[in-house]
Regions:
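Membrane-proximal linker segments that couple transmembrane helices to downstream signaling/catalytic modules
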Residues: 3-117, 124, 128-131, 135-148
Length: 148
């Protein structure tokens, strides 16, 4: 039994003995079922293979249709994976894609990479990027350039 809280793709399971009481309660509330676990795997596979998140118009309804599920089950799977909702989940993948493309396509600007990744609002992108990476996108690009 563990709580995934940030990047569900890279965090190892946390032993129950190390969890805070609030985290244990959160796990119980989610009531993870095999359906939720399978949906979580389907979501990750869909994002990895289809890259639907790069479409700025990709909607919750399209996501539900792609997964052939309902909003209640989706929310349980999102919370199980440590996300607050659909937007948080999509933005997570967009940010990972931005970072991946920034390394591969160094000739592109932050703005071009932002649009390529599916973000449409510069201010929302910068705010989200800074909240996750603890630096601005420009600082991130400078860091990449210094590394090479």
């Amino acid at each position: 039994l563990y709580l995934r809280n940030e990047n569900p793709l890279s965090l190892p399971p946390q032993p129950v003995e190390e969890l805070e009481m609030e985290e244990i309660e959160a796990i119980r509330e989610i009531a993870v079922s095999p359906v939720v676990l399978e949906l979580s795997n389907q979501m990750q596979s869909l994002m990895k293979h289809s890259k639907s998140f790069t479409n700025p118009q990709y909607s919750l309804q399209e996501f539900l249709n792609d997964l052939n599920t309902n909003e209640n089950r989706l929310n349980k799977a999102l919370h199980y994976d440590g996300f607050s909702g659909f937007r948080d989940y999509i933005n997570f993948y967009r940010l990972q894609y931005f970072k991946e493309q920034a390394q591969l396509k160094r000739e592109l600007t932050v703005k071009e990479l932002m649009f390529l990744s599916g973000f449409t609002s510069r201010s929302s992108f910068y705010r989200y990027f800074a909240s996750v990476e603890k630096m601005s996108p420009s600082e991130y690009m400078e860091m990449l350039n210094r590394e090479n």
